[in-house]
UniProtKB/Swiss-Prot annotation:
Protein name: CTD small phosphatase-like protein
Record key words, sorted: Hydrolase, Magnesium, Metal-binding, Nucleus, Protein phosphatase
Cofactor(s), by name: Mg(2+)
PANTHER family, per the entry: DULLARD PROTEIN PHOSPHATASE
Protein EC: 3.1.3.16
SUPFAM superfamilies: HAD-like
Residue numbers spanned by region Disordered: 1-25
Species assigned in the record: Homo sapiens
Length: 276
């Protein structure tokens, strides 16, 4: 059974002790450290990811260039050829439909699923909130899903303030039924899955320019910096969540988003907080 091919997750440090952390985990570690220092403002911790995980993304209009290809004898290939990975331009057809009358004038918040709102496992979890059957290679497997504390309050308030979109790098066969159970209020106006991501240098990236919304009015909430590498200035990072039932990350975010909903554009407030 190829579980990781169905669900896109970060590694739970409890299950992988002794492994040296990679760059993609630095943001999570930074948030863990700040979690222990609750005397500091919760808002300032959102932006530690930009300080400790400084990924320079290529401009959307420019190709991404890798180092020259080297032959086995150490020489460069003919013409010093380089691998060029183009960053896709906005498509003729955007990922989201037109804004509804209900959401007219609201900002768009893109919300991740795994380790942001829930944690899922193919291993049995005694206190699972949901058990979702998923078909893999003709066999039905059970996925055990834990809800992050305060996710219900968070989603309900976000649905009142914003046009909310679920955007996950996991496959729809798993994520869609989880969203059915999680979102009892119809908060998510749209759901985007792995096929809507851009595969860039080994990561599934959520390219916000493909949504069809003005970028100055788009926010992404995600535990993985690789997911928003094209638009880090639009991100509100969150700590990866696995099973800590005392976690208050989502609850702490609500006042922040209440303030953000009143801003003319997201960059001004995010920039101010980043430089506090």
């Amino acid at each position: 059974m190829d579980g990781p091919a169905i669900i896109t997750q970060v590694t739970n440090p409890k299950e992988d002790e002794g492994r040296l952390p990679g760059a993609g985990e630095k943001a999570s570690q930074c948030n863990v450290s700040l979690k222990k220092q609750r005397s500091r403002s919760i808002l300032s911790s959102f932006f530690c990811c930009f300080r400790d995980y400084n990924v320079e993304a290529p401009p959307p209009s420019s190709p991404s260039v890798l180092p020259p290809l080297v032959e086995e004898n150490g020489g460069l290939q003919k013409g010093d050829q380089r691998q060029v990975i183009p960053i896709p331009s906005p498509p003729a057809k955007y990922l989201l439909p037109e804004v509804t009358v209900l959401d007219y004038g609201k900002k768009c918040v893109v919300i991740d699923l795994d380790e942001t709102l829930v944690h899922s496992s193919f291993k049995p979890i005694s206190n699972a909130d949901f058990i979702v059957p998923v078909e893999i290679d003709g066999t039905i497997h059970q996925v055990y899903v834990l809800k992050r504390p305060h996710v219900d309050e968070f989603l309900q308030r976000m649905g009142q303030l914003f046009e909310c979109v679920l955007f996950t790098a996991s496959l729809a066969k798993y994520a869609d039924p989880v969203a059915d159970l999680l979102d009892r209020w119809g908060v998510f106006r749209a759901r985007l899955f792995r096929e809507s991501c851009v595969f860039h240098r080994g990561n599934y990236v959520k390219d916000l320019s493909r949504l069809g919304r003005e970028l100055s009015k788009v926010i992404i909430v995600d535990n993985s910096p690789a997911s928003y590498i094209f638009h880090p200035e639009n991100a509100v990072p969150v700590q990866s969540w696995f099973d800590d039932m005392t976690d208050t990350e989502l609850l702490d975010l609500i006042p922040f988003f209440e303030g953000l909903s009143r801003e003319d554009d997201v960059y001004s407030m995010l920039h101010r907080l980043c430089n506090r």
